[in-house]
Every structure is written in structure tokens, then in C-alpha cells.
């Protein structure tokens, strides 16, 4: 029988548990008083023998034995062993209570899913519910001594109404050496399937819900059976019991009061009654009694589960729910808050203190002064002042390595750029399109200014120029002649009219207009792609195709004509990348992989001329003719993904070029 005292400890008061200490049923006094009396009697008997019956020599020997037992009895880990054992027992006890079978969910499903107000429908619902209660009864009868005393045989089960005589015969005819608590579950499933076939259960989903819930109910019963079958290992129980009783057996001798005149350490007083030793026995032995009572909650102790009450309650409630309450509904009426959007139930005078406003959050009443609100430029000030003096930024800046543009290292590298990539989009305009302008036009981010200055400086990408370029071309139709064009770009941040090719060139030999060799530092050049004619020493191949939109392609021998380039930029300004344009397209020549490599200096190399103020007068090309080459560029872009040539550039150092003369990496398209 469970001892309930929840109402007495509902409120914390001064010495609130004092009333619980006076209870007898389910108390520690009722469990421990016998052992406590035995321990006190044994202690008193040994004390009387020591004081009255022993001689002087025998007393000296007993005193040495008492000191020895007191010293080494503390080495027994009673607290450690008891703590783990009682924790394990309490967890096991609570898990068994959580898994007690309750038929409330099943009776709800049966009452709402099995239809029919006639006698057959009523019989179906009551029979299904009776099978559910019979399953739990068979389990309780096998694990609980109190239930077994109530139903010692199956005849008592039939007499109690949980099983009919025909069901008893069928149950007994099943020859099985195992516990047959699962038989009512099979009957439940068969009867539910029959009700589905008869139309009493109108949907297969309802049948599945019934079977799922019944399977859950059966698993609760199986778990209780498993707890009864497999308990806490016997060794653990024996170790705990021996540790506790051995410790207090040693205390019977070791905690005796010795003669104070002998001067033993800790034996200055002779109180006759060992108060703290008795308290220690009360606590440790009572701790062990807690584990003994909770290790099997299906017994007949004061704090064991009320299994017989569970059987009665489940049967009464379940039959009431599926029979008398089936389709029994009260008349619907409007509630008292029908026209009130904010329902507010009344409070009594005793509960008036519990009427409190709704909780809206802990920060709802927190106020902030005007100085705590940041200004609009707080992020800029944080980046300007906080990051400038950042220690981590200084460490990273110190540990970072920067390669000088004039580094004498020779490096051979390759790179690949797919034809579907953005190779015709220059980096500067693309980056400008993604940049978000600051709110203040007179204030710019330091990082943004730094990126723009790096973007405009030809020396910035010197360390990036070690990668050679890979251009996708066609051996048959890529190298073709295009009509001349020119494009003028006034600002590096303005999107060009003609798509450009981003070429990352390694340190390669470059030739100036006066045939002098110069030191070509690595840079990123933004070229307007119109075609480049390689060295005259290479093999020339006639183009196999003509770009659409150019009916009269210009074909000129490479030995008699030169490729003219226009350099559109202020020669004295080093902030922006150099841009080259081809004023006219000559006969294209294809370079195979076998012919790659640095060529000797030839007087017939393409002459690269920087742009001047009058490019039209020199080349005869009007500046506004750049927009007429859009079909040619499209044709070239379509022919890029046919084949890939890998070009290799070797780092060779030549003499310095004069100031203002652009560097010319050798590139084949």
C-alpha cells in the first residue's frame, strides 16, 4: 500500500517535515526497529563483559583489539557501496511504475472506432476491453504476490469475470511451457479484424491504430515480466549487505568506551551510551532497508504498488467507457464566453493573490539611456579604430610573406580556364558591380580603398602572375581573321564595350618596339580580345573557317606585315592595368603543343605600339568602330570549348624596359 503525504508537504513551512517523522506506516522505524534493538543489545552485552567480567590482562588485550577494529573498520567503503546500490534500486523502482499497464488509450479508441449501438456492437466493445484487462491480470498474477493471493488459480479468474468458461477451455488446451499472458492479445487482434470485415470498424486506419495501441499495452506488460525475471545481480546485493553488516559488527568492538586512565587516543571520556554510533547504524542500516523495500515493488510492503486496486480500477473504467458512454453526448450549448473574446474565469477571495498579469519577457521593463544607443556610423568607427590596433591583425601582417616583383626565381606553372567560365569578364568591372557604396559618399572603407588601389596597380599582381594561362582553342576554326576594331576605355571601373580576356601571365620574355629585351615582371593585363599573332618563326596554318558576319576576311602574310596593337592608357600612370587592342586582324596561325616554348628574338615579331592622342591618324581606325565586332566575338566564344592547348612560359630575365613601355606576355589563342 502506497503511503501518500503530498498534501502535507505542499507548502514549505518552518520545520515542515516534523509531522512526517511521527508517522508509523511506511516509516523507517517500522522497518528498522528490530535490527536497531539487536545492535543496541549486543553493544550493551559486550560493554558489560568488558567492564565486569574481564581481568586486568584480559582488559588490556580487549583494548588493543578495540583500537585495531576501530582503525580498520573505516576502510570499508560503506557510503560508496550503498550510494550506488540505492540509486540503482530507486531508478529501477520508478521505471516499473512508469510502465504499469493502463487501458485508457485503448478504451478511447475502442469507444470511438467500433461502431454499433445494437447488442452485437456492444458485445464487441466489451469483449475487446475484457481481453485487454485479462492480459494485465495474467501479468500481475505472475509478478505480484498480492494479486496471486487474490487469484491463486484460473478458476478464480473465471469466477471474477475476466474469462468465460469457453475461453478457459481454449486457454488450457494451448500446450505451451511458457507463460501464456499473450493469448488474450491474439484474441484481441482476431476479433478486431473480424469487426473490420463486418464493417464495425469502418476504416483500416482505425484498425491499425487499435493494433498499434494494443501492441504498446502488451509491451508494458512484457516489460514488467522482464523486470521480475531479471533483477539486480545477486552479487551486488550480497556485497552491499555484507559490507554494511560487517562494518557494524566491527563497530560493536571498536566503538566501545575504554578505560580513560590508560590514556588511549580518543578515549578521554566514558559515556556508556554510544550516541553517534547508534545514529550511524540508524542511517546506514536504514539506507539499506530502503533498497530492500524498493527492489520489488510488487510485494506487500507499505510502499509497494497497489496492483489489486489497479485491476479493479481498470476494469470498471474501461467497461464504463466502451458501453454506457459509447455515443453518449451531452447537449451542446453556448458557453458563457460566447460573445467575449477575452475569457476570464473568476477568482475566489482565497485565490485572489494568484491573479497576476501575463509574463511578457524579462527585458520588457528595462530602460536604456540615450548614450547607450549607437550612432549610424558605429560600424565604421569599430572597423576604423578597433581593427586598426588589433593584435591578431598585426601578428598576421608580420607573419605574412610578400614576394617581390623582381624575385629572381624561375618557376614553371600551368593553369586551366574552362570555356564556360567568366574569362571574358574583366576583374575590375565585376568587382565594382558587387561593391556596395557606403552611406556617406565622403567616407570610404579602408579595406575598399586598399582593394581599389591594389586593383589599379600593375605591381599588385606580381605574385599572381606565376600561373601560366590555358586557352581553349580549335585546331581547325579558332584562329581566324576578324575585322579591325578599336575600343576606348576612359576609366578602369567602367564596363568595356567589347568583352575582355583576363590573362594571368608568368614571367616571360617580352620585346619592346626597338627590339630591346626587358625584364617582364608578372602582372595581370586586361586585353580587348581581338586576336594575337604569334612569332614569325612558328608554323602558319590557314584558317579553315570564316567567322560569320565578315564576308571579306583580311589575310596578310606574316612575313610582310606586322600585328599592330594599341595601348590605351596614360603611359605615366602606373595605377591601372595596361590594356592592349589589335587594330586589325591578320591571318590567323595555329600553334600546336609541339611548337610551344620561348622563341628567339625575331625582327618580324608583332610590333606593339602604345596608344597616343591620335590613334586614328596612325592606324586609320575610327574609335567608334568597336561595336561592329560583336558577331566575331560571339563566333570566337563558340569555338573556344573545342580543344585546349596548354601553353608554357619560362621565367627569363632580360634587361629593364624603359619607363612607360608596357610589358608584353606572349600568348597564343
UniProtKB/Swiss-Prot annotation:
Residues 440-451 have a biased composition (Basic residues). The chain crosses the membrane at residues 32-51, 61-82, 238-255, 275-288. Residues 533-543 have a biased composition (Polar residues). Residues 399-496, 533-560, 591-627, 646-669 are annotated as: Disordered. Residues 646-656 have a biased composition (Basic and acidic residues). It comes from the Eukaryota. InterPro entries: Bestrophin (IPR000615), Bestrophin-like (IPR021134). Residues 1-31, 83-237, 289-669 are cytoplasmic. Ca(2+) binds at residues 10, 293, 296, 301, 304. Keywords: Calcium, Cell membrane, Chloride, Chloride channel, Ion channel, Ion transport, Membrane, Metal-binding, Transmembrane, Transmembrane helix, Transport. Residues 52-60, 256-274 are extracellular. Residues 475-492 have a biased composition (Low complexity). GO terms for biological process: inorganic anion transport; negative regulation of monoatomic ion transport. GO terms for molecular function: chloride channel activity; intracellularly calcium-gated chloride channel activity; ligand-gated monoatomic anion channel activity; metal ion binding. GO terms for cellular component: chloride channel complex; plasma membrane. PANTHER family: BESTROPHIN, BESTROPHIN-3. Belongs to the anion channel-forming bestrophin (TC 1.A.46) family. Calcium-sensitive chloride channel subfamily. This is Bestrophin-3. It comes from Mus musculus (Mouse). The lineage of its organism: Eukaryota, Metazoa, Chordata, Craniata, Vertebrata.
